[in-house]
């Protein structure tokens, strides 16, 4: 049995098109409904969504402890790396939810808090410097799962980087990360396990003296919205309910994340159902980008350089257009960005230039044609999927 405490929110994304009611709480409860005997969701739900949410929970066999709220909240995305507008802040918080269960997965929420008690608890604060115990929550064993910059003490370093106009990064550097873990362990009630998400489906597990890296696992596509929720849910099931070792549970969570992002697909398979997933090797080679198309591709090419650097990639050069590529001896391209209005004539010119792109991003209905000209390339019409494949090692 597992109890999930978390938000239910609307999610809207332009690329890829997505308009659904999920949020961390609802997504996680659905995720584990196939592998857990009993799942309960404890959440605030806007009155106009209550009937739909109840029907959704019933279809997956999830028990709902739903509390009415009056303010629907929506997360807006341009694409899955860019959240356009955060939800409006609530005028006041609703009363804290109170949950007690053997196994609890607790998410941070926008509209309220949750006071929980459990034998094994997984806490995903979804905010920097959050404390599990400050509201009276208790746990026999506590696992905390966070993004790197959510660790206590990292906020100051992040603000410093921004003030110096340095390149944004998904993860703190190793020194900052280790200092944050040490500071966390010095708290009066530290978590026994800390898992840091790497943004591509992998994890770093801190338990004992040595951190253990758990790789991301291979996926054909990469639907990023909600991937962290699925990671937390899968780990909570494997560690909390199945009593797996934390590292083994983290491997299961990473495999489940790869399963989810290929769809998105819910609910999740069992441990045996994802055992054949192959691990990724994160790219260490330098990345080469070429943009092909209209003026906006020049801007997209440089923006993409920033995103790949954010994900930990090392971009060696960015080129707009085909001129001079052969003379520079740089025909092997890691990412070819093709404009949505790029003509087949321009694309055929790229093929005649004998480029050998590893990944092609082409947000066009004609994207399938790219496979004819570049049969060995991964062709993606989704931006996050293209970046994901670029970040996988070319030597795999």
State what each model feature region is:
Residues 1-43, 48-52, 215, 221, ...:
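Glycine-rich phosphate/adenosyl-contacting loop at the front of the ribokinase-like
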Residues 21, 26, 218-281:
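Conserved post-catalytic alpha-helical subdomain immediately downstream of the catalytic base
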């Amino acid at each position: 049995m597992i109890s999930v405490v978390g938000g239910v929110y609307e999610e809207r994304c332009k690329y890829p098109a997505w308009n659904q009611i999920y949020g961390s709480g609802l997504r996680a409860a659905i995720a584990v409904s196939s592998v857990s005997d009993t799942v309960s969701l404890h959440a605030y739900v806007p009155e106009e969504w209550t009937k739909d949410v109840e029907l959704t929970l019933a279809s997956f066999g999830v028990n709902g402890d739903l509390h009415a709220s009056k303010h629907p909240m929506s997360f807006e995305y341009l694409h899955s790396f860019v959240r356009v507008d955060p939800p409006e802040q609530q005028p006041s918080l609703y009363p804290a939810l109170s949950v007690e269960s053997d196994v609890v997965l607790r998410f941070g929420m926008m509209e309220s808090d949750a006071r929980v008690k459990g034998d094994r608890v997984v806490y995903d604060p979804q905010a920097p410097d959050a404390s599990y115990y400050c509201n009276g929550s208790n746990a026999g064993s506590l696992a905390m799962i966070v993004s790197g910059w959510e660790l206590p003490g990292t906020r100051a370093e992040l603000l410093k980087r921004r003030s110096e106009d340095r390149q944004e990064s998904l993860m703190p550097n190793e020194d900052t990360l280790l200092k944050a873990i040490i500071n966390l362990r010095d708290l009066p009630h530290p978590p026994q396990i800390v898992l840091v998400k790497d943004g591509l489906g992998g994890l770093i597990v801190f338990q004992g003296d040595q951190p253990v890296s758990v790789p991301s696992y291979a996926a054909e596509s990469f639907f990023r919205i909600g991937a962290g929720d699925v990671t937390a849910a899968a780990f909570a099931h494997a560690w909390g309910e199945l009593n797996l070792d934390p590292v083994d549970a983290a491997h299961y969570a990473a495999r489940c994340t790869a399963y989810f992002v290929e769809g998105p697909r819910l609910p999740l398979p069992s441990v045996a159902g994802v055992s054949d997933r192959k691990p990724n090797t994160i790219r260490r080679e330098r990345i080469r980008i070429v943009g092909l198309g209209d003026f906006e591709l020049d801007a997209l090419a440089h923006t993409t350089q920033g995103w790949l650097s954010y994900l930990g990639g090392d971009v060696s050069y960015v080129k707009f257009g085909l001129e001079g590529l052969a003379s520079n001896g740089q025909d092997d391209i890691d990412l070819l960005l093709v404009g949505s209005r790029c003509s087949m004539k321009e694309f055929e010119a790229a093929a005649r230039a004998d480029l050998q792109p590893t990944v092609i991003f082409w947000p066009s209905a004609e994207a399938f044609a790219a496979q004819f000209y570049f049969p060995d390339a991964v062709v993606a019409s989704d931006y996050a999927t293209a970046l994901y494949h670029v970040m996988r090692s070319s030597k795999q």
